[in-house]
From Swiss-Prot:
Signal peptide: none annotated. It comes from the Eukaryota. Glycans are attached at N202. The gene is phomYe. This is UstYa family oxidase phomYe. GO terms for molecular function: oxidoreductase activity. UstYa family oxidase; part of the gene cluster that mediates the biosynthesis of the phomopsins, a group of hexapeptide mycotoxins which infects lupins and causes lupinosis disease in livestock. Within the pathway, phomYe catalyzes the desaturation of the Pro moiety into 3,4-dehydroproline (dPro). The pathway starts with the processing of the precursor phomA by several endopeptidases including kexin proteases as well as the cluster-specific S41 family peptidase phomP1 and the oligopeptidase phomG to produce 10 identical copies of the hexapeptide Tyr-Val-Ile-Pro-Ile-Asp.
Amino acid sequence: MGHRQSVDYTSIPPSELDAHERLPRRKSRFDLFYGWKGIAFLSTLTNVLFISGFFYFGTHLFSPSSSFGHEECHLGSERLWERPVPWKKVVLENHQEFVDGDPWDSKFAGDGTSSNGGAPSPWDSVWLPNWVALENDPAAQGYGFGTPLTGPGSEGNEHDPTPWTPGSQAFGLAVMHQLHCVASIKKAINDYRYTGGHRGSNSSANIGHVDHCVEVLRQATMCHGDMSLIRPNVKGHSYTGYDGWGNEHLCRDWEAIEDIVREHGISFVKGAGMQGWTHLKKGVS
């Protein structure tokens, strides 16, 4: 039986190995990022990301439609105005002239078609047409079913000094409908308060209209859901409920609304050889 020989091995110090005798190191995939090639790669990647981000945010933040903000704040149909109606913070206060004023003495008496010709009424300052025209072919943009102002079944005034463009349609405007209802209810209250209903508020037709307006305002109030906090009134050391004045609310810019309605507002003209929806004369409100 043979004898197993034992051999002792001694490690060679690294310093005694020649450079070409050392085992080659396996290249790492991260070696690409070292040296001038890695710098060039990272620089190119950074530039691509920057340019992509610039175009993305430029398209989404600075496009004409971006000024309308999120759909939570603006309806898609508002793009038909070609400019947004902004929101602004407003502290609401009592305007006693509207409390004391009577819409019967204003354009609201006949929805702008008549007035008593007396002293100016504060209600005249908030009267605007209930109807507007969109002349950028709203049906082609997904907002049709308005009153046609051109083509078959048109209700546009064919003798309007400003011809209607093809595809124009007329629509009511919610804010003016709601304001019309506020004035109608105020008229009915004043009629019963001062004349016992002799101005017509006690007719079945007018009572039905007032009921309709109350329902319109009920739903509009719930729709807008104003969550502004109202501070209570204080008398001495007691809190006595609240009247709602002096608190901040988030409101649409009324001046912007006025500009749009004056630009797009229309009136129904009948007589003098003309009939149909007609552009408002410039400067007329």
